C-alpha cells in the first residue's frame, strides 16, 4: 500500500507539478475518477457523492462529494505527502525530497500538486462527482488502485489516488528516487539532497503558495461568502438538512466546486485547496501567495465551488473548531460551521485539510471536512485550484518551489521534527514546506516546519472535515467545517491562507486553533524558528498580524484574542516555551497579552483548550483558561452561528483567520529562511527541553489532561515546541497529542478553561504537551502527532473560534474521521481526518444538526485522535458527522438542541445535545478538538468530555462499559456508524456514507476495542498512500489493533487484528515500500511512517486525541489520559486490566465517563489521524469492540459488544450504511446495559447513507444514543471486576477460598459460561452467619514486634548478629501474641492460647546465656543514662522472654511431656505389631494350610528328583517366586492355582462375604519390614535420657520459682515424670520380648541370616512374606469372586430345580424375563 500510495502521490505530485492535466493524471487514482468523470466529473462526483453516502442528490451532493473526494484525494496525497514528509523528516533526503517535492508535488499533490493540477483534480474530483465520502475514499483509495481501484472504492478515492498518484509522481520527480519504495523507504537518504532542494523549493513554494493561497483564500473567502451565504443557510439549517449540512458543505465545496465553483474554482479552488491543504499552515501562504484568485469559487477546487460550503466550513471549522470565533456556535457548529468558518475555516480548513491531507489525512480532511470538499480540498482543491483561477496557485504550489514550499515547508521541520524511521514517516513531510504559513492550525496537515505540519496535520484532522476550513487557516480549520470553510475563505479572504488564519486562530484561539501560532506563523510565512518551532514573535507582531488578518477586527479584539490564545495555552511567552511547556497555569497566566513580550505558539503541547477538547468536553473556552476561548463576540457568533447562519459566524472567524493567516503569512514571510534556521536550532533546543520536560513532567500529560498541562503545554509546550513544533509538530504534535491525549483526558477540569483558547499548537492539530515530555524523545512522534494534533488544534481552534461549531458540528464522526484518517491513514493523521471530517461533518452535521438539535456532528470519537479533540474521546463523542459526501442527518437524539457553549467556552461550540439516552449531552468538543464530543451515551449518563483541542482525545473516553466512541467511518466508506462500545452496548456507528457504510465495528480484536493508536503505542493504520488506497496504518503496539486500512486495491480492508491480538502492523502502504514499523509498545504509539504517497502520514493521534490516553497501551491498559484542563479532576487511571480509562469529562461535561472497566481491556485509543477515528474503546465490561472498519472499506459492522453476543454483520461495503446494529447487550458481568442504538445509528443511518444527509447517527459512537444512563456512568465507574453489588455481611465470615470468575473481565466473550445463566437465589443469612461466621475467631492481635516500640535506627543498639537478629525478628512478626499470653502458657501449662509449636519456636530461639548476659549488661549500663540508646526489637523481645520465670526450664519440660507421650505410644504400637505378626505366622491356621499346599505341590512337581523331591519344608524365599511359575499353556501361574485350590478345598467360606484372608495383611507385613530393633532401642534410650533431663529441669523450677508460679507446674510435672518412667521401662521390656519372639519365628521358618549379619532382620523376613502375601491376596480376591459367582449360579439352579417346571408356564417369548415368568405363573 505504502509504495502504491507513494506512486500515486508521486504521480499526483508530478502531475501537479507538470500541470493540471499532469496533476490529474498523477492524481490518477483520485483524479482518475475525476478525470474519467472529467467531462462528466459532476456525474462522477454525484455518483461518488451518492456512493460515498454524500451524493445526496448527485449534482450538488455529488459536487460536494467531488470536492470532498478531491479533498480526500488531496488528503491522500497530502497524507502520503505527510507521510513522505514524516519519512523525510526522519529519513532526511527522502523526507525532504518527498517533503519538498511531495509537499510540492505530493502534499502539493495533495494540496500543491492538486493546486498545480488542481484543475484536473478539481474537475476530475468535482466533475467525477467525488463526494466527501469519495474524497475520503480516494484517500483511502489512494492506493495504487489507480483510477480503477479508486473508482472501485469511491470516485473520490480515484481522485485521491490521482492526487496521490500525482503526488507520488511529483514526489518521484522531485525525489532522487522517484520510486514509491524510495519515497516510503527508510532508505530515502538519496533524497536528502532532494530534500534540501525540496525544502528550499518548498519554502519558495510555500511563500508563493502562501501568496497564492492568500489570493485564493481571498477568492475562496469571497466564494465562500457567496457560497457561504448559500452554505451558511444550509449549515444553519443543517439540522433539518443535515444531509444538506454535509451536502451544504459539499455544496459549498462540492456544489460550488462541482458546479460553477468547480469550473472556476476547480483549478483555483483545487489549487487553493491544495495550497490550503498543503498550506493549512500555508493558509497565510495562500493569502500571502494568493494563488491567483482564478475565481472566487476557484480558490480551492472544493473551496471555490464549495466556497460557500467550504467557507461556512472554514468559518465553522476555523471559528468553531479552530477558534472560538463567533462563527463557531453550537448551531453554527452543526450548520453554521460552514458559514462561520467559511473564510477562516474554509481557508484554514482547506489549508489544514490540505496540510493534513498532505500529512495523510485526506480521508479525514476531505471526507470529514466536506463530503466532497475534503476530497476536493485534497484532490479537487488542488485540481480546481489548478484548473481554476487558482491554477496559478496550483502552479505556484506544485509548479513553483514557492508553492511547493507552501505545501511543504522545507524547513528542517521535516528532519528536526522527529526521527523518521518508517517509510511513511520519511514520506510524511512533517516539516515539509508544503504546509503553508496559512495552514489551518486546526489542520496541521503538513506542518512542514514541524509545527506547521504538525499543526496542519492537526488542523487536517480537526479541519480535515473542514477542508474548506483549510483556507481558513489552521485555527479555524481545526473544526474543519466541510462546507463552511469555503465561505470562511471567501469571508476571510483578508485572512491570508490558513497560515494567517492559523495565526489568527492560533493567536485568537491558540488553544482552540488547530495550528499553533508558530504553525500559523509558519503557514503564514511568518519567519521564525516558529516555523520549525513555535513562532517567536513579539506580541505587537502578533497583533499586527491579527489586525492584518482580521481586517474588520479592532485592535482591542485582536489583543483580546491574543490573550485568549495565551489563556488557551496556544500562545506562550517565549520564555515559557522553554520553561514549562506543560504548565497550563503558565498558559493561563499568559492570558494577559503584552505587546512587547516575545511569544511563541505552543508547539506540541496541547493548549488547555486542546485538552478540553481532548477531553471531549465541549465547553468552549473554559473561563478557567482565562480569557474565553473566543471573544464574547466570537462565542456569540458561535451561538449565533448555531442559531443563525454560520456564514455570519464564519465571517468573524474568517476575519480572524484572515488576520491570523496574514499574521502567519507575515511571520512566515518575515523569517522564512530564519525560521528554518531558528526552527532547526529551536527544535533542537525544544527537543532537549521537551525530552527534559517529558522526563520532568511525565505526569504533566496527566496534568495537561487536568487542564493545567494543557494550558501550560499549550503555552509552554507551544513556546518550547513552538519552533520545534513546526517541525516536530507532526511528530511532536502527534506525540504531544499522545501526551496531551493523556493530558486532555487527565485534565477534564481545566477543559473549560483550557478550552478557552488552546494555543494554536494546542489546537487538536497541536495539542500542547510538555515540550520536554513530548518534544524531545517524542519528537519523532511529534511530527506525526502534529498531524494528528493539527486536527486537535483545529479542534482547539474550533473551540476558541467555533466552540459552537465544534458543538454544532461535532468533529466528523469518528467514522468520518476514521474514514478520513483511514482514507489518508498515512497521509493525514486522524486529526487531519478529524479535521476533515470535522469540517465536513461539522459543516454538514453542524448545518444539519445546528437547526435540528444543535447536535454537533458526532464529536470526535473518544478514541479518535483525529477528531482532534473529540469530546467523545473524553466523553461520548457526538455521532460523527456523515462523511463529507453525505450530510449527516441529525441523530434521533440529535434533535436535542446543542447545549449552549459552556461558560468558559465562549468560542467553543455548544456541546452536542446528549444522545437520546444520554443524560447529559457531552460538552461540545473543544474548538481545537474539531470534533464535538458525542452526546453522552444513553447509559453513560454523562458523555466523556470532549478531548482537549490541543490534546488529542485519549482513546479512553469511552467508559469501560460504555463502549465509547466508535471510530469515524472510513473516509471513503462514508460514515460508518461508530462501532458499538463493547461494553457500551452502543450500536456501531452507521457505515461510512460512501462505503455503503457498514457501521465500523470496534476493532475485531475486540476483546479490547482497538484504542486509537496511542501516540507512542501505535497509531491506527496511517492513511494508505494516495495510489495505494488507504492501507491501514500499522496499529500502535499498545494501541489495541486498529484495523489497517484496506490496501488500495483491496476492496475491504482486512479486519483489524483482534484487540487482544495486539496491534498487527497494517499492510505496508502500496507506495510505502516498507510498512511503517508498529510503534514501540512502551513508546506510546509512534505515528506510523507517513505513506510515501500520502504526504504526511497521519501523525499518531494527537496527545489529547486519544492516543495520549492509550500511549501506555503497549503492555499495560491504557493509562487514563490526564484530565482535560477544564475537566476538573482527571478520571482515575484505568484499572490494570481496564485498558485506557475514559478521559475525565470536560469541565462542562459533568461526570466524565468512568474509565473502562478492568475487564474491558484497553479501550481503543483514539484512532490515529491517518487511521481515521478508531472505534471507541469498548466498555471495560463489554470486551473489545470490533476494530473500526478500514478506511478503504465501508465500515465493517462493529463487532458485537463483548457481552452482546453476535454483532449484526457489517453491511457490505457497497451496501451503503446498514443500520447500525443495535449494540449487543453488555455481558452480564458488564453491569452496563447495552447502549441504545445510535439515534440514527440503526436503519436511520442507512437511510442517510446514500444521501448527503446521512443521519448523524452519532456515528462517532458517542453521539449514538447514550448508553443506558446507568450503563455508562454506573457500569463504567463500577469496579471493572464486578458486575454485582458488594455484599457486607453483618458479621465477619470465614473465607471461602475459591477462584472467582467475573464475566465482564473475560476477554473472550464468545464462549458462554454457565454463570451467565445462573442467578443467585436469595438466601437466609442468619443461620448461615451463625454457622460460618468468625465468631470463634479470637481478636487478631498485632504482631508482637509491633508491641515493642521501635526507636530511630540510629538510636538502636544491636547486640545480636545479623542472622540471629533476623531470625528472631521473623519469629516476632509471626507471633500475634502478647507477652502476657506467652507467660501464662508457660507458667500455667495452658496450651489453649499458645500452642506447643509456638512454644517450641520460642524455646529454640530463646536467648542464650551469652546473649542474655549482653542484654542484661546493656540494660544495667543504660539505666543511669538519660539518653541511653534502646535495644533493637529482637533484643528487646529476647529480654522480655527471659523475664518469664524459668522460661527455658519450664518450656523444656512442657515440650518433653508432649513428645515423650507421642514417642512411647509410637514404639508401643510397632512392637505390638511385630508380636502379632510373629504369632500369626507361627500359629495361623491359614498360613499352615497355604504352606502345606505349597509344599505338597512342590514335592509333587519335584517328584523323582533326589535333590529337591520329598522335601519336608522349603525355604521361604520361594514364596515370592510362585507367581512366576507358569502352567504348560501359560494360562495361569502356580500361585493362582494354589490360591484356587485352597479356596475350593480348604476354605469353607470361600465365595462368601465372611471369607477371611488366610495370611497376614500385606500392609502389616510391609510396616514390619521397615522396623529395626536398633531404632527401638535408640528411641527408648533417648526418651529415658530426656526424661531424666526433664526431671532435673523441673527440679530447678521447683527450687527457683516462687510459690505463686510453682503450681500447677510442679504437680503436673511430678505426675508426668512418675508415669513416664513406668512407661519407658515397660516399653524396654516389651522390646526385649518382641525381639526374642521375632528371632524364634525366623528360626521357626528356618530363616538364616544373610552373610555379614548376626541375625535375621525384620526387613529380610517380613519382605518375603509381604511380597508373597500381596500376590496371594490378589489371586485370592479374583478366585473368591469367581467362586461367588459360581455359587450364585448353583443356587439359582438348585432353586429352579426345586420349584420344578410345573410351577411355571413358560412361553418362548417370555422365557427371558423373570417378570414375565412370574406373571405367567399358574
Curated annotation (Swiss-Prot):
Residues 193-231, 670-706, 1567-1597, 1677-1699 form a coiled coil. It is a peripheral membrane protein. It holds the Pfam family FH2. GO terms for cellular component: actin cytoskeleton; cell cortex; cytoplasmic vesicle membrane; cytosol; endoplasmic reticulum; endoplasmic reticulum membrane; microvillus; nucleolus. GO terms for biological process: actin cytoskeleton organization; cell migration; cellular response to hypoxia; DNA damage response; establishment of meiotic spindle localization; formin-nucleated actin cable assembly; homologous chromosome movement towards spindle pole in meiosis I anaphase; intracellular signal transduction. Residues 758-1268 form the FH1 domain. Residues 207-227, 322-342, 389-404, 427-441 have a biased composition (Low complexity). InterPro entries: DEP_dom, FH2_Formin, FH2_Formin_sf. It is found in: Cytoplasm, Cytoskeleton; Cytoplasm, Cytosol; Cytoplasm, Perinuclear region; Nucleus. Expressed almost exclusively in the developing and mature central nervous system. Residues 344-355 have a biased composition (Acidic residues). Residues 172-182, 821-838, 845-855 have a biased composition (Polar residues). Residues 51-60 have a biased composition (Gly residues). Residues 1283-1698 form the FH2 domain. Residues 1715-1722 are annotated as: Important for interaction with SPIRE1. Induction: Up-regulated in response to cellular stress, hypoxia and DNA damage via NF-kappa-B. Actin-binding protein that is involved in actin cytoskeleton assembly and reorganization. Acts as an actin nucleation factor and promotes assembly of actin filaments together with SPIRE1 and SPIRE2. Involved in intracellular vesicle transport along actin fibers, providing a novel link between actin cytoskeleton dynamics and intracellular transport. Required for asymmetric spindle positioning, asymmetric oocyte division and polar body extrusion during female germ cell meiosis. PANTHER family: FORMIN HOMOLOGY 2 DOMAIN CONTAINING, ISOFORM I, FORMIN-G. It is linked to Intellectual developmental disorder, autosomal recessive 47: A disorder characterized by significantly below average general intellectual functioning associated with impairments in adaptive behavior and manifested during the developmental period. MRT47 patients show delayed development, with cognition and speech more affected than motor skills. This is Formin-2.
